[in-house]
Amino acid sequence: MTENSAVEVDEGVFESTAVIDNGSFGTRTIRFETGRLAQQAAGAVVAYLDDETMLLSATSASKHPKEHFDFFPLTVDVEERMYAAGRIPGSFFRREGRPSTDAILTCRLIDRPLRPSFVDGLRNEIQVVVTVMSLNPQDLYDVVAINAASASTQIAGLPFSGPVGGVRVALITSDENKAGQWVAFPTVEQLENAVFDMVVAGRIVSGSGDDADVAIMMVEAEATDNVISLIDGGAQAPTETIVAEGLEAAKPFIARLCTAQQQLAVKAAKPTGDFPVFPAYQDDVFAAVEAAAAEKLSAALTIAGKQERDDKTDEVKVEVLEQVAPNFEGREKELGAAFRSLTKKLVRQRILRDQFRIDGRGITDIRSLSAEVAIVPRAHGSALFERGETQILGVTTLDMVKMAQQVDSLGPETTKRYMHHYNFPPYSTGETGRVGSPKRREIGHGALAERALMPVLPSVEEFPYAIRQVSEALSSNGSTSMGSVCASTLALLNAGVPLKAPVAGIAMGLVSDQVDGETRYVALTDILGAEDAFGDMDFKVAGTKDFVTALQLDTKLDGIPSKVLAGALSQAKDARATILEVMAEAIDTPDEMSPFAPRVTAIKVPVDKIGEVIGPKGKMINSITEQTGANISIEDDGTVFVGATDGPSAQAAIDMINAIANPQLPKVGERFLGTVVKTTAFGAFVSLLPGRDGLVHISKLGSGKRIAKVEDVVSVGSKLRVEIADIDNRGKISLIPVEEDGAAAPAEQSEEAAAEK
């Protein structure tokens, strides 16, 4: 990495630059500029990635605090402008409307590391608005947005302990380097060869330059959709050890980005304003509450059941507050906050000193597990997963591929065949509240569960269905998102979806403090809701028995030792294995598809026959639909998806389509003298008839011997005598070579002779 710089490029306009060196993968340049745009905002920074991707971040603050608030009113908004990609919005009014899922998830990525960086007790409203103004289609803007938001906040004169640096690192493999290299700010094209991809945010806690000590604050990570095929090709699997290495690899990049922001702040930051802070309570209030409640509350916190424990804790709270309230008139809110702080202190003390938790478990114990499938009668697939008092219902729905979600955002994804929706109704925690459209938290949890399962889903060729997975959090006491991963795996298998491997998830926690003069860290397996709230880290890990598929980390600490993090990952792997065993007892292979699910078959027709299948004004395809009752969807490449409620209806539609588009279907056993038209790593495509090709797999080309490359035996243009070994229900033809002198009559048919028929 080269040195950063901060210069005045015009009167009052300053910029700084961070150059990220990825070795053989090239360099990426992040440039921060302030003083030109949005000058009335408290802080405004334009961030560029290689001068083509451009984001404006503006930070504003209210002049007066909201004294009646008992929380920090920070709002983060991401505005995707379609002009950034040279497009007009597809909505009816042709302008941007509600934020896309990508924008909402980016808001969460920004909020999570920024919020803990503000001083405790701040009650002024702070708003950060990031506008995507230009986007190279090969770039992902979310990590650029993290840096832009941090930079604009850093110069806004706020009590902010930044800057925060954010980087996406991907483990990209190649034929020469199967172990892979961690590449910062990878392009969309480079991610196709990545086995793991993570967004990491952090800040410098000591030192400077690339060797600065960086504290990781937030991680959002996932295995890529291609991970299993890449592993099969010899690539490194993203195990817990590899993930830990990736976090370390991200730190120098974060240091570089933070340094660039610091240098910009030196030139352009406003002096920190006088912002009043409102501590949750004063020391005298805490001392009084502790003296009155410590003994009774300690006893209440040993009750294992959540409901009974909460009831007893509430009883103690009412009793104690009545006892001490006369001494603190007008400070009732402080009393409640002090009681909560005392609860946190006692919970943490028991974990650190006794290695026991509030429900009586040891630090590595998992709550009781239960898994059951086929819960909802007419659903295509359903399952109920329970872990202690957390209960998740997973429901799977299958439909035609044309029902895939159309995505109108700035991201590279235009359709989603697999959709995961997570619902968290208020009754799941025994409370009342608003129900309706999903909140940001629900969207984020659904996206995490979706990413955990994407690597193991079958391709559209293997399973030609659109899949909607819904996770209903019926009862919550810790990590409903990871419970959703488990319930979804069970429901998908119950629906007959051929997953490449089952996936389970577990939530980890961390508690640390000074004990006997040393910093002691205790990692907790399967955390409760209270342990999440009172702990120092929320660490969710999902994966198969062999590798990690998704990971999410948020920490309140200024850095977690690598050894502690590695230990937590190891604990998570052990817990995942235990959960997978319980899930396998409920279902371990795909069930038969539900009679209520549509039967979808994919067949192939020549592209020049698509018009004939559709017919003038859709007459032919409508006729087939009316006669058979099947739904038919035709793709531009000639793939036809036929869906029906029963097999005979689908087959009738397929026969009618083939009668139009494939009138001369070859049969198994026929032989041809064909021409090799394409070679790939797995075989050679041979033209048999006009518009009709078949595949000779590489394993069939060596006359019984193993060959390294297809081109060692045949090349494009070669004549090859072949026999049809199989034709699948999609019309794909599998071929085997045959000897010249053993050819039967059909083998005398050359491609040219067949064309004359």
Swiss-Prot record:
Belongs to the polyribonucleotide nucleotidyltransferase family. Gene3D superfamilies: GHMP Kinase, N-terminal domain, K Homology domain, type 1, Nucleic acid-binding proteins. It is an enzyme of class 2 (transferase). GO terms for biological process: mRNA catabolic process; RNA processing. Mg(2+) binds at D532, D538. Residues 669-738 form the S1 motif domain. This is Polyribonucleotide nucleotidyltransferase. Transmembrane segments: none annotated. It is found in: Cytoplasm.
